[in-house]
């Protein structure tokens, strides 16, 4: 490791100055746990919420989102709305995986040397990737809500330009395929927008070699760049832009769209797609509910300068909850989703059954040896 020189001193005086054996002290550049005391009650709370609940919910969410992505990608489920829900499931998978890294692995840094090392090595990639996935999830939710609003409230002429009502490639027409292509183009644009919006995060941290006084060994750590330490940048990008682009703006827009959808459904219901519309409305409601706490944390910091670690941990947990629970809504309220998933699960089980029977039938069953002679002759 570059810079490591065991002949140099590592005394309390040198550590207080941020150096040890010629290396920087891990955590010195941003005041990690090695240089500050953590309240025991909060440490226990953090372990339960981030160390236990988050990975448990996240693992279940990965399974649910994988099933959701599989189901919505089937030929008989193709429609403009389902294309958005497929993309949402994929982005939620990335959110959960990066949440394991950004929240759970970060929590384990206080308890594991390998967690400290790999957190630092992977941070420059995982940090912007996770935030890009969150941005995609937000805007895909908004786009799907708008698609749903067009489906229930717009005229047939306007509707044919933006959404496809049919949920089967076998009965769909050319306009359905054209509208699905439009949705795919919108998703690609959302992806590019997410990369552009989160590109500053790639220049916020850098990796250094350091000496861990906690584990008494050389390790790696992440430190903030001059950009991340700039007060004006933090205030404009993290406070104002995040509030408008990622928090208040989408939530208010979704409340308006959801309200319009519900009103339109009351006036004229569409039996063929009603379950899909209800599913989307509930997905939006879940999104709004899970974003109340992050909004509260953001406003407390913006208006009053209050930074509450307990609320921050809970808001991080709500991010994972939001990404993990959509499958429950899809399966409970989406009749097409439930029917399609059951069909493929049964088909998979039926394929395994003949294979198992073939393996068991490699030798003739003994029951044939017990048949009466007359039946054998026949």
UniProtKB/Swiss-Prot annotation:
TM segment ranges: 47-67, 85-105, 120-140, 180-200, 243-263, 277-297, 315-337
UniProt membrane topology term: Multi-pass membrane protein
MF term (GO), any: G protein-coupled receptor activity
Location of this chain's protein in the cell: Cell membrane
UniProt key word Membrane: yes
Keywords noted in UniProt: Cell membrane, G-protein coupled receptor, Membrane, Receptor, Transducer, Transmembrane, Transmembrane helix
Gene Ontology cellular-component terms listed: plasma membrane
InterPro entries referenced in this protein's UniProt entry, alphabetically: GPCR1-like (IPR053326), GPCR_Rhodpsn (IPR000276), GPCR_Rhodpsn_7TM (IPR017452)
Cell cycle as UniProt keyword: no
Family from the record: Belongs to the G-protein coupled receptor 1 family.
Name this polypeptide is given: Probable G-protein coupled receptor frpr-1
Gene encoding the protein: frpr-1
